[in-house]
Regions:
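N-terminal Rossmann-like NAD(P)+-binding subdomain of aldehyde/semialdehyde dehydrogenases
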Residues: 1-119
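Flexible, glycine/charged-enriched surface loops at secondary-structure junctions
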Residues: 98-103, 225, 262-267, 287-297, ...
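A glycine- and small/hydrophobic-rich beta-loop-beta segment
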Residues: 258, 266-341
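Conserved NAD(P)+-binding/catalytic subdomain of aldehyde/semialdehyde dehydrogenases
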Residues: 175-263
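Conserved small-residue-rich beta-alpha loop and adjacent elements
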Residues: 103-169
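Short acidic-hydrophobic, aromatic-tinged amphipathic segments that line or gate anion-handling sites
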Residues: 1-7, 178-183, 303-308
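C-terminal core of ALDH-fold dehydrogenases
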Residues: 318-427
Length: 427
């Protein structure tokens, strides 16, 4: 990890830069696959599964028999953990239900909002080196609570055509409607356009590699909404002299092991803490099975020494991390100053892993600085809000002339006339 001591404000813009993700170079490949999926449906999906996932599939759909079999293939301990996590995620997201109210903006003018679930949503769960069954819970649970009628899940199978059993069990626990064996760009295209087997959805959620990111961005231009732009995983830890260096190092490594393009940042006011965390990172790194991945991520990462905790907080807000851990003695006062972050973890015992799995908050969060403008996945992500307004004759008299004047000054005569004919009818 690169160590930076007492950087000036002028240096901050360079410090907060992430490794650049240039998906433009992938767009030609992604576009070719998406076009093929749009034209050829299931046959194209199966062909790309054979090419990229090295599996020959007769059918894309996961059967009920496969799901039942999966339940006997995971330990009771894991099943109980999935159920507990699902309960907590449900409890947290249930509190996010929208309760709109009717408001009279002027006499005779009543306005309100209605929250309506997106009818069909698609969830993408990547394959790779670890089965992300936790992401199944994070995406499917709020979709079910929101009232989405159809929850489709796509995930790549292994070379034997099997989906990891924990993913199947998590999908059943969370209420997924149907599961399909498809990964990568072909899965995104199938959900965006629809195939003979895989239904077209209206919004796609879920993480993935750069090809998946590029595919989501492309389909979002014309065919299907997406949850948010995405980048590599990241964490920022703010520490002071009272922090536990073993805990801090463990938190940094928990994100570094995600992928070689992950980034972890330590901001501290203590030179001694910086040194002790550096030592702990090196010690714990040697014990990790994913040491090679974490080591490469650490090469993109930084330890930053600053003068005050206020400065640390300002630097963090400039960075806008996906995950922010405030492991300081006065974490409560610093928490009030957070304005840019995906999810925040307060105190010595709130490890980021808790939010990743079982505290109840959602772990699908904006990365790569998008926390400046985006929220993480929440219940509203699965809803649309439709506005209503009702005008009585009194309402026409209240706002009619203002509407006429504004329309006239925008030179939209038909707009003005739509109000004028009503005013005349009341004369």
């Amino acid at each position: 990890m690169r160590i930076i001591r007492y950087p000036s404000r002028e240096e901050w813009s360079n410090i907060v830069k992430r490794p650049q993700l240039d998906v433009s170079l992938l767009n030609a490949i992604v576009d070719e696959v998406l076009t093929d999926i749009r034209r050829n449906g299931d046959s194209a999906v199966k062909a790309y599964e054979a090419k990229f996932d090295h599996v020959e599939l007769q059918s894309l759909a996961v059967t009920d028999e496969e799901i039942r079999a999966a339940e006997g293939m995971i330990s009771k301990e894991l099943y109980d953990a999935l159920v507990l996590a699902h309960q907590n995620i449900s409890t947290f997201h249930e509190t996010q239900r929208f309760e709109g109210s009717k408001i009279q903006t002027q006499p005779g003018v009543t306005c309100w909002q209605k929250s309506v679930p997106i009818e069909k949503v698609g969830l993408y769960i990547p394959g790779g080196t670890a089965p992300l069954f936790s992401t199944v819970l994070m995406l499917a649970t709020p979709a079910k609570i929101a009232g989405c009628k159809e929850i489709i899940l796509c995930t790549p199978p292994d070379r034997h055509g099997n989906v990891h059993p924990a993913i199947l069990v998590a999908a059943k626990v969370a209420g997924v409607s149907r599961i399909f064996k498809a990964g990568g760009v072909q899965a995104i295209g199938a959900m965006a356009y629809g195939t003979e087997s895989i239904p077209k959805v209206y919004k796609i959620f879920g993480p993935g590699n750069q090809y998946v990111m590029a595919a989501k961005q492309q389909v979002s231009l014309h065919d299907c909404a997406i949850d948010m732009p995405a980048g590599p995983s990241e964490v920022c830890v703010i520490a002071d002299a009272t922090s536990n260096p073993e805990f801090v190092a463990a938190d940094l490594l928990s994100q570094a092991e995600h992928g070689t393009d992950s980034q972890v940042i330590l901001i501290t006011t203590s030179e001694e803490m910086l040194k002790r965390v550096e030592e702990e990172v090196n010690l714990q790194l040697e014990l990790l099975p994913r040491k090679d991945i974490a080591s490469k991520a650490l090469s993109n990462s930084k330890m930053i020494l600053v003068s005050t905790l206020d400065e640390a907080m300002q630097l963090s807000n400039t960075y806008a991390p996906e995950h922010l851990i405030i492991a300081t003695q006065n974490y409560e006062s610093l928490a009030d100053k957070v304005v840019n972050a995906g999810s925040v973890f307060l105190g010595q015992y709130a490890c980021e892993s808790a939010g990743d799995y079982a505290s109840g908050t959602n772990h699908t969060l904006p990365t790569h600085g998008y926390a400046l403008a985006y929220s993480g996945v929440n219940l509203d992500s699965y809803h649309r809000k439709i506005t209503f307004q009702h005008l009585t004759p009194e309402g026409i008299r209240s706002i009619g002339r203002a509407v006429e004047v504004m329309a006239e000054n925008e030179k939209l005569d038909a707009h003005k006339n739509a109000m004028t004919v009503r005013i005349k009818a009341l004369s």
